[in-house]
């Protein structure tokens, strides 16, 4: 290795540096809002520099932000929300003192850093609450108790990938661990404690085999012979093959008694006789069961991977997939349950760096220099990757790549003394190691303090997970590898449990934990499919879906939209004009046959345009169209865009120009759809076009006949909300929050959507309710909830008397944070519209990123599986594997297509509407049949699905960041294009100004443009 530092002797090899590491007006008869106090915003915590003496980052290098700490969730039971003191929420109006805010929740920045010693608060009864006793923390909120189990549906048995875990009868002790000098690597920490146990288990540890979390906590099944003890532990560096003496490192380890983990409380909680889950006891058991897998495999999160747990499959561009398993212990109705699932992720192939680069670029680089774009791509892919040198025989020193040189190797020199003498890298390697560098036109890798390593002397170290964004081909390859038939997945899970041999796990034995090797048998019910209403002019006026599916044959959309003027632009070079004309003609005929008032011909002939001229072509053609329509005082209703199959950023550019600049909705079609052009493709396109121009495809028969409990009896608005985060490695991109809400009642089928940008990886939706100071109007209230409530009133003529809020994307550890902040925002938004206006709220979290899978009890029984071998749509489980006391359920609302279906998990965090289990399960399942884009039931409730689509669409509205090292991040509360035009800016944690999203045109805002 060549160094740029002036020095008297060359440190050609050195140890690895080690760091891993506006409201827009009021609806009629809404009262004037009361002035609201201006909320103060608190800045986010300061950024942290990695520990240890690390070199300054090379030019353009990004600083990695520290993740926010998230408080551990504690399970609770229900609090009465108004005058009731029973376990479920009261149906009477909210107490007056709580109308302004049911909870004074902290701002997101305050929630991100919980107090280390929170005050001990008693649960609050809202009936006796005064303004001085408004709940302010998770300790004062109780989630609703389960209101009994559901009874509707056909009963059946299913199997779940949960394995009963016997609760140990042990006296668990918790000890604090301090290791000096402090290191950030869990691997090093574990090595230190492992050596300590090897040396002192029989003596100082009293024969105990402790379980260690790799950080600050150590647990034992019984007390150690001391309350505090100091140890000196020496570790030797790995043998690098040089034959030289291995470096020693000495650590001071202090172990102090901290507390006892109360397993009795856990037992009471599992039996439903204790309200709060003892999180520490659960954490201990989880750590114990992770000890052995952490030593055997590569741990990431709650999963463990190995190249020997299945076939390694190439993913392309230097990546490969490793198989593994997910493991988590959970409290359930059947007791403790170990959830085991198959898993796979991408690893970097252990290739010579020069071969990795050739795969990454899909090009032979052995005889040519790199372009600037290629160099940037390589730099992003290799930064942080660990390599070992190969030019010194058996000596394999390891380094972590920090960057890439701009100059090729042949131009690189470095000072060798303080007199200014310089030497080239090529000369240095020849003289020092007798190694002739062959590829001198390639850049060098930079490691440590900008020392140089030629690519050809480096090989990537095995076992490094790839945490950056995968491209579409890699995602497809990974999905193909992980996609398993339900029967095969069940078989592999059972094999993995037997392979892990928990009965022989020394840590499980030490702590008395016994794991069953049989999947849990669970009672389930198959909910009936709802009857769907279509237009009276069709041959079939309604239909009953079969196995989650139906079609549009002999049916007309219940409310067909109008498209009087439309045009088509073709960006696909291989699609001839005659083909485009034929496709447009057939699509228009299908839209007419489906019930739409659709003009048979476009107002202008289809235009062929270059894919690199999207904005220019669209705006020019729109101008031509308006020259025709303007004198007639008409507007353009629709754009049909034909795109290449691999269209890169073309799709996003088209959507941005249409929705932000021109104010028209669009329907994109890929080349393969145009050439194939069968009735199914055309019918699906017609479904999407209809809702984009304001129509309805279908509604529930029970909705129009007003037979849906707690929905059709009084005006009800259903919300869906989601936050999408940028991909790993995109440290400067904001998170996008989206909220949609039904705009028709009792049909609950049309949804308007709002979006906003907010702080990077911020999960709380910061723009639900906002107030700001206007120079003319004074204090102004706004936010997404308020605007959607006003929009509902304008559309239906009714004020919502009931709110059902489906919230997607929330992990279990964030339940309290999200409920405290977002329910408070809903309350304030309602109060800002009218004094004493507080509709009853039910707040439900929707989860798909879990690892519970349900399998048919008998895979050979054709009456219990669909065509893909999965459980039937409508299968619901609210027993055994669900929460011991709280209101949750698993629902597989869709028919499988490929692989193993993943049921959605619904967890009720707040319920003032007093839903029964049957009422909420039936409502949720039935709504899944109203998704606008297809004639199938979908896997999650449509409002949550629409929120995800809206958030995904909004990412196209942001200006692309093409810099190599952008540092701009978004901050809290940026008004989005759908929620007004406030241009106020706040500050992000790093002090950078927040960049609002561009404003969406009102003509687009009113319809389901995101479908």
From Swiss-Prot:
Molecular function via GO: RNA binding; RNA endonuclease activity
Coiled coil: none
Segments of skewed composition (Basic residues): 1-11
Region (Disordered), start-end ranges: 1-95, 107-147, 963-994
Gene Ontology biological-process entries: regulatory ncRNA-mediated gene silencing
Superkingdom assignment: Eukaryota
Domain called Piwi: residue spans: 638-959
Family designation: Belongs to the argonaute family. Ago subfamily.
Function recorded in the entry: Probably involved in the RNA silencing pathway. May bind to short RNAs such as microRNAs (miRNAs) or short interfering RNAs (siRNAs), and represses the translation of mRNAs which are complementary to them.
Name of protein: Protein argonaute 1C
């Amino acid at each position: 290795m060549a160094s740029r530092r002036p020095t008297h002797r060359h440190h050609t090899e050195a140890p690895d540096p080690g760091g891993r590491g506006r409201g827009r007006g009021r609806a009629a008869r809404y009262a004037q809002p009361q002035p609201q106090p201006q909320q103060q915003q608190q800045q986010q915590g300061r950024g942290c520099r990695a520990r240890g003496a690390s070199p300054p980052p090379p030019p353009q290098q990004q600083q990695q932000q520290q993740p926010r700490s998230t408080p551990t969730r504690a399970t609770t039971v229900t609090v009465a929300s108004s005058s009731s003191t029973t376990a479920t929420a009261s149906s009477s109006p909210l107490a007056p003192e709580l109308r302004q805010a049911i909870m004074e929740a902290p701002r997101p920045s305050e929630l991100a850093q919980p107090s280390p010693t929170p005050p001990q608060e008693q649960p609050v009864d809202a009936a006796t609450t005064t303004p001085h006793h408004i709940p302010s923390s998770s300790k004062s909120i109780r989630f609703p108790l389960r209101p009994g189990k559901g009874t509707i549906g056909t009963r059946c048995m299913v199997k779940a990938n949960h394995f009963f875990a016997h609760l140990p009868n042990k006296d668990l002790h918790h000890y604090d661990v301090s290791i000096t000098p402090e290191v950030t690597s869990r691997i090093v920490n574990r090595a230190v404690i492992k050596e300590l146990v090897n040396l002192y288990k029989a003596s100082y540890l009293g024969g105990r085999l402790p379980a260690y979390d790799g950080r600050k906590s150590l647990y034992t099944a019984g007390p150690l012979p001391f309350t505090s003890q100091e140890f000196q532990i020496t570790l030797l560096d790995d043998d690098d093959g040089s034959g030289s003496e291995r470096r020693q490192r000495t650590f001071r380890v202090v172990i102090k008694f901290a507390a006892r983990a109360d397993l009795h409380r856990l037992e009471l909680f599992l039996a439903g006789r204790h309200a709060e889950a003892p999180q520490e006891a659960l954490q201990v058991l989880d750590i114990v069961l992770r000890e052995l897998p952490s030593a055997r495999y590569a741990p990431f999160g709650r999963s463990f991977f190995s190249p020997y747990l299945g076939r390694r499959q190439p993913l392309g561009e230097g990546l490969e997939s490793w198989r593994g398993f997910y493991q988590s212990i959970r409290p359930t109705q059947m007791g403790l349950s170990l959830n085991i699932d198959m898993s796979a992720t991408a690893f970097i192939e252990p290739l010579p760096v020069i071969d990795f680069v050739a795969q990454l670029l899909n090009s032979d680089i052995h005889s040519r220099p790199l372009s600037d774009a290629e160099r940037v791509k390589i730099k992003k892919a290799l930064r942080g990757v660990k390599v070992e040198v190969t030019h010194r025989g058996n000596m394999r020193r390891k380094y972590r790549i920090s960057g890439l040189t701009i100059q090729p190797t042949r131009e690189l020199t470095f000072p060798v003394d303080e007199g200014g003498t310089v030497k080239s890298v090529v000369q240095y390697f020849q003289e020092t190691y007798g190694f002739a560098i062959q590829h001198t036109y390639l850049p060098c890798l930079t490691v440590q303090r900008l020392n140089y390593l030629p690519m050809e002397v480096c090989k990537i170290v095995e076992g490094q997970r790839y945490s950056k964004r995968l491209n579409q081909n890699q995602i497809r390859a990974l999905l193909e590898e992980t996609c398993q038939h339900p029967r095969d997945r069940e078989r592999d899970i059972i094999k993995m449990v037997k392979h892990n041999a928990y009965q022989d796990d020394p840590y499980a034995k030490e702590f008395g934990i016994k794991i069953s090797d049989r999947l849990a048998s669970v009672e389930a019910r198959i909910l009936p499919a709802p009857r769907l209403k279509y237009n009276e002019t069709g041959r079939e006026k309604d239909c009953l879906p079969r196995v989650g599916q139906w079609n549009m044959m002999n049916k007309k959309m219940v409310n067909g939209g109008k498209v009087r003027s439309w045009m088509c632009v073709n960006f696909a070079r291989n699609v001839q004009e005659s083909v485009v004309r034929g496709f447009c003609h057939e699509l228009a005929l299908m839209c007419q046959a489906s019930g739409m008032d659709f003009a048979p011909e476009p107002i202008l002939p289809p235009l062929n345009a270059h894919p690199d001229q999207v904005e220019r072509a669209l705006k020019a053609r729109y101008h031509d169209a308006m020259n025709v329509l303007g004198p007639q005082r008409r507007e353009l209703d629709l754009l049909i865009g034909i795109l290449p199959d691999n269209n890169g950023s073309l799709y996003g550019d088209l959507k941005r120009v249409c929705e932000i600049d021109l104010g028209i909705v669009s329907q994109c079609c890929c080349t393969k759809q145009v050439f194939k052009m069968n009735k199914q493709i055309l019918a699906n396109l017609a479904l999407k076009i209809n809702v984009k121009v304001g129509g309805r495809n279908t509604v529930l028969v029970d909705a129009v006949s007003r037979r849906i409990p707690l929905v059709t009896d009084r005006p009800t608005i259903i919300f869906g909300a989601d936050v999408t985060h940028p991909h790993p490695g995109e440290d400067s991109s904001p998170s996008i929050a989206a909220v949609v809400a039904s705009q028709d009642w009792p049909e609950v089928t049309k949804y308007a959507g709002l979006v906003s940008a907010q702080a990077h990886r911020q999960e709380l939706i910061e723009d639900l309710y906002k107030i700001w100071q206007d120079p003319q109007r004074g204090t102004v209230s706004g936010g997404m909830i308020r605007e959607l409530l006003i929009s509902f009133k304008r559309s239906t003529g009714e004020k919502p008397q009931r709110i059902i809020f489906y919230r997607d994307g929330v992990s279990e550890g964030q339940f309290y944070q999200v409920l405290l902040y977002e329910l408070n925002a809903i309350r304030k938004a309602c109060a800002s519209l009218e004094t004493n206006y507080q509709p009853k709220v039910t707040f439900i979290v929707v989860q798909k990123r879990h690892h519970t899978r349900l399998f048919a009890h008998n895979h050979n029984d054709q009456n219990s599986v669909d065509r893909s071998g999965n459980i039937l749509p409508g299968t619901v489980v609210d027993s055994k594997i669900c929460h011991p006391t709280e209101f949750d359920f698993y629902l597989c609302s869709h028919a499988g297509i490929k692989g193993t279906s993943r049921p959605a998990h619904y967890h009720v965090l707040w319920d003032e509407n007093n839903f029964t289990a049957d009422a909420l399960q039936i409502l949720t399942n039935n709504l899944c049949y109203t998704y606008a884009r297809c004639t199938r039931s979908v896997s999650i409730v449509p409002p949550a699905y629409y929120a995800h689509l809206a958030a995904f669409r909004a990412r196209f509205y942001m200006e692309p960041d093409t810099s190599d090292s952008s540092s701009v991040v978004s901050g809290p509360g940026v008004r989005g294009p759908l929620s007004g035009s406030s241009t106020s800016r706040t500050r992000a944690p790093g002090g950078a100004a927040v960049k609002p999203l561009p404003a969406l045109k009102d003509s687009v805002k009113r319809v389901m443009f995101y479908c």
